[in-house]
């Protein structure tokens, strides 16, 4: 069963390092309290690890898609 990850931006991008802002852009997170669903891959996990202090991560099963 393939898992997806629900990622929510909980802290502002203002005053962050340009590398962290670029990582958030790559993840598709542009506004606070917005979320995206991403595939659970090592590349995505590395990006999430870089900006872990700004986001909330939840694992979703294949049938549990968020609305």
Swiss-Prot record:
Keyword Cell inner membrane: no
GO process terms (BP): translation
Annotated disulfide bonds: none
Keyword list, A-Z: Ribonucleoprotein, Ribosomal protein
Pfam family, any one: Ribosomal_L30
Superkingdom assignment: Bacteria
A GO MF label: structural constituent of ribosome
A GO CC term assigned to this protein in UniProt: cytosolic large ribosomal subunit
Quaternary state and interactors: Part of the 50S ribosomal subunit.
Family the UniProt entry places it in: Belongs to the universal ribosomal protein uL30 family.
Identification of the protein by name: Large ribosomal subunit protein uL30
Source organism (scientific name): Hamiltonella defensa subsp. Acyrthosiphon pisum (strain 5AT)
Upper classification of the organism: Bacteria, Pseudomonadati, Pseudomonadota, Gammaproteobacteria, Enterobacterales
């Amino acid at each position: 069963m393939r898992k997806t990850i629900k990622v929510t931006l909980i802290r502002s991008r203002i005053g962050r390092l340009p590398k962290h802002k670029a990582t958030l852009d790559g993840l598709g997170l542009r506004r606070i309290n917005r979320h995206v669903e991403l595939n659970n891959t090592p590349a995505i996990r590395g990006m999430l690890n870089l900006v872990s202090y700004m986001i909330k991560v939840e694992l979703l099963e294949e049938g549990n898609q968020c609305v």
